[in-house]
Amino acid sequence: MRVFAVFLAACLMAGCASKPDYYISPAPVTIPKTATYWLDTFDVEVVGKNERFLPDDKVRQQLGVDLVDRLLKAKRYAASKDKADYLLDVNVIYTRRIQDTQGGFMTAIVDDKTILASVDFNYQVKVKKAGAEVLHFSQARQGLMPGGYKGDWQNMKTMAGVLTNSGNSSVETFYTGLLSRFIVDDLRDIPSR
């Protein structure tokens, strides 16, 4: 019975520590850790529209600029499409979770639809070479909220927005300036054989 319990515990720990799934083509794939990428297509769908927050085009632009900037800083972005080792097709669904008490008790404190409570950041990345897909991966990151010392500052601004009933529309630039790091981290974690 103890052996079974240890085996079960090991299986649970292995599942919790797993990385994203990488779907690789039938032919063996080798992607060096120094490979460079070029952003071929970048599509963003924004869910949860609200005039208080950034327009869809601005969200799309900020996420794309942040992704390219992070790849440049990691020395993984090519100088041109022709010089890139791999091309990337990125599809993003950016979902705002906007507070709505539907006339509940909180409405007496802060107006509905003025507080961005969290965001969902879901994405699929296809890595291509010579026009053919080499691999793809996807992630669904739900309920993301500001964290760390910069996030604590954003949370304080949100609390001030609640107390003054002015909302927290400024927190969205915090999200759009950080979320692309998840994609870059996943690209960095692609196994090289």
Predicted regions and their residues:
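C-terminal/domain-edge helix-coil "capping" segments
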Residues: 17-29, 126-193
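Sec-dependent bacterial lipoprotein signal peptides
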Residues: 1-16
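Residues embedded in well-ordered secondary-structure elements
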Residues: 5, 28, 77-79, 112-114
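Flexible, solvent-exposed loop segments that connect beta-strands
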Residues: 46-55, 103-111, 152-161
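Surface-exposed short loop/turn segments
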Residues: 82-150
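Solvent-exposed, acidic/flexible segments
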Residues: 56-64, 114-118, 164, 168-172, ...
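Short, well-structured beta-strand/strand-turn elements
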Residues: 73-83
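A structural "domain/chain start" motif
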Residues: 15-69, 74, 163, 180-193
